[in-house]
Amino acid sequence: LKAAGVSAAALGLAACGGSSSSTASSAASSTAASSTAAKADGKVYYLNFKPEQDQDWQDLAAEYTKETGVPVTVVTAASGQYETTLMSEMEKSEAPTLFQVNGPVGLANWKDYCYDLSGSQLYGELTSDSFALKDGDAVTSIAYVIETYGIIYNKELLTAAGYKQEDIKGFADLKKVADDIQARKAELGVDGAFTSAGMDGSSDWRFKTHLANLPIYYEYKADGIGSTDAIKGTYLDNYKQIWDLYITDSTCDPKLLASKTGNDAVAEFVGKKAVFYQNGTWAYNDVKDLGDDNLGMLPIYIGVDGEENQGLCTGSENFWCVNNTASEADIQATLDFLYWCVTSETGTSAMADKMGFVIPFKKAKDSTNPLITIANQYVADGKTSVDWCFSTMPSEEWK
């Protein structure tokens, strides 16, 4: 699947496009890309976006320091607070040498701080140029993980309710099954068909971003575009009906959603109190206690024509950027660290086995994450992956 999953994501990245103007700072940095600054003088400060992989990055950083002697500091922003944290950290004298943007919209705010990676070994390891964001000829950022999301489900509970995955081929089927489970929840020993759709900061991104991607994707697809200044809202009624299903066939009263958290949803799913849980491949470590053979994944159906051929949502919102205001030694240390992460046995094993990542680099290891195996099967079966178009959303306030 590496090839299949990466191809699906490439479509999403290409659809979002990039800016066309180049900056003096990024152009000037290309010469320094080949510099051989002494490692002993350099250090790395990574401002990580993904809280669920914080410990994995801490461990990998410690291993790199043990092997090379180069100090690597990893700081992880709180969920939903990355942009605010980045703005604050970049004002400091010891600013991050490595940070992230979520795509073209995020890059627009930070491109003047992005070192040109076009001459770097890291860029040379990419399996496709589609995974790089550019500003003119300068490579400003590089995607480092390809992820997939949908509706994770408990096979045992679905079977106990009298259904199998083949019974759910669209929104109407999903609603029929969920409504039935909700009506029989006491009999089945669950609290609801779906886990709570918590709207606090640890969980709301699943719905205001990932779920909202579906109507945007279908509007872009219908109009043959990759971005727009303003959506028409063609599929907002479809968005509403899947959201309504999430909150009516839920483990909790809709009045409680504002206070429900991501941890609540995980506890409900792992505790076998809900059959369905919207999340992605990155959530495997949270749900693995159910057993690999007990995990399934459905597309997020919203009731559009032809959705029986729809697959899962595949793409990236994680792009590495190297801070061009850092010292030459720190820039080189950061480039060396990234190259080690995506080429060494230690780095690629950690990203595949511990973080559960599919990475778009030549030496990537096949992931043991069963949710990724499921995602690959959808592609192998000819299902159409849904591109990640939410990176074109203008801001958190817009959401």
Regions of interest found by a model, annotated:
Residues 140-144, 149, 175-228, 274:
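Extracytoplasmic/periplasmic solute-binding protein
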Residues 116-130, 193-194, 198-201, 216-241, ...:
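Short, solvent-exposed loop/beta-turn-alpha elements that line the ligand-binding surface or hinge
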Residues 178-179, 225-259:
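Glycine-centered hinge/linker elements that transmit conformational signals in sensory
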Residues 33, 102-153, 206, 296-298:
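Hinge/lid segment of periplasmic solute-binding proteins
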Residues 89, 96-97, 123-158, 192, ...:
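A structural signal for short loop-to-beta-strand junctions that line the ligand-binding cleft
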Residues 3-12, 16-19, 23-106, 119, ...:
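Conserved N-terminal structural module of periplasmic/extracytoplasmic solute-binding proteins
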Residues 143, 314, 356-363, 373-399:
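C-terminal capping/gating helix-and-loop segments adjacent to ligand/active sites or protein-protein/ligand interfaces
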Residues 62, 66-67, 71, 160-161, ...:
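Extracytoplasmic/periplasmic substrate-recognition and gating elements
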